[in-house]
Regions:
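Conserved glycine-rich cofactor-binding loop
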Residues: 18-19
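Conserved glycine-rich Rossmann-like NAD(P)H-binding loop of the short-chain dehydrogenase/reductase
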Residues: 32-49
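The beta1-alpha1 cofactor-binding region of Rossmann-like NAD(H)/NADP(H)-dependent oxidoreductases
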Residues: 64-75, 107
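Substrate-binding pocket helix/loop in short-chain dehydrogenase/reductase
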Residues: 101-102, 106-111
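Active-site helix of classical SDR
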Residues: 125, 160
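Residue(s) in the substrate-gating loop at a strand-loop-helix junction
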Residues: 144
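SDR active-site lid
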Residues: 177-242
Length: 274
């Protein structure tokens, strides 16, 4: 018996779709029957991904876009309406991480982090909200375990993800009145290129050596399957990876123990070159 595809005929809009979780989600939503809108800055990556998805039998629209630029996401949403006639799922995934001790960072570093990770999410929501109201669709916000637990040496990133978590908690009941399900995704360590993006948001070919044991890092394809399942079930939040779930559990039930673990891990984590 053929398995029913959970997003058959849906139009799925994904920011940050050129690599990592975003690209894996595009593949997984397409596997589940969706047509995908690939939104990111790197057009060559998007074109290659679109060709892969089209070859597998689904439609893919490429929209080069910078979530920090006013107007880009409105243009992307308009192109989606023209191509697919509707919008069923929106995934606000674009983001990067600013790292460093407080004394080594400036207010501009924090502003840059928020411009992508927070205001980029808001721009995505504003650009697509009316479309989601029409389809009673799904809004997916990419948070992080770092939105539950602050990590020394990553205060801009943690602050931005705490903000996304607050936005999701506020919007979930607010948008439920319009039939829109809001799902917050809180990943732990997932394989991605985030470590190849510097504090200015510029991608570099070589990433710093990873201080994280490989066993704690989930493949993007596995993470994407778990995320799509959570979106299909209209869950309020999904914490991804066993490590991430353990961290959130300890934060709620043994915060003192977790603080000790985080301090030890953060010291090791900050020894890497930048």
């Amino acid at each position: 018996m053929r398995r029913r595809r959970r997003f058959a005929g849906n139009a799925v809009f994904i920011t940050g779709a050129s690599s990592g979780i975003g690209a894996a989600l595009a593949r997984e939503f397409a596997r589940e029957g969706g047509d995908v809108v690939l939104v990111a800055r790197r057009q060559d990556r998007l074109e290659a991904l679109a060709a892969e998805i089209t070859q597998a039998g689904r439609r893919a629209l490429v929209v080069p876009c910078d979530v920090t630029r006013d107007g880009d996401l409105e243009r992307a949403a308009a192109l989606t309406r023209t191509a697919f006639g509707k919008l069923d799922v929106v995934v606000a995934n674009a983001g990067f991480g600013v790292v460093g001790a407080l004394e080594t960072l400036s207010l501009d570093d924090y502003r840059r982090q928020f411009e992508t990770n927070v205001f980029g999410v808001l721009r995505t929501v504003y650009a697509t909200l009316e479309d989601l109201k029409k389809t009673r669709g799904r809004l997916v916000l990419l948070g992080s375990v770092s939105g539950h637990v602050g990590v020394p040496g990553s205060s801009p990133y943690s602050m931005s993800k705490f903000a996304v978590h607050g936005l999701a908690a506020s919007l979930a009941p607010e948008l439920a009145a319009h039939g829109i399900a809001v799902t917050l995704i809180s990943p732990g360590f997932v394989e991605s290129e985030i470590r190849q993006v510097d504090n200015r948001g510029v991608w570099r070919r070589e990433a710093p050596a990873r201080p994280i044991p490989g066993l704690l890092v989930m493949p993007t394809s596995t993470a994407a399957r778990q995320i799509v399942r959570a979106v299909a079930h209209r869950r309020r939040e999904a914490v991804i990876t066993g490590f991430g779930k353990a961290v959130v559990f300890l934060q709620r039930h043994a915060p003192g123990l977790l603080a000790t673990v985080v301090r030890r891990f953060a010291v090791k984590g900050r020894r890497e070159p930048r």
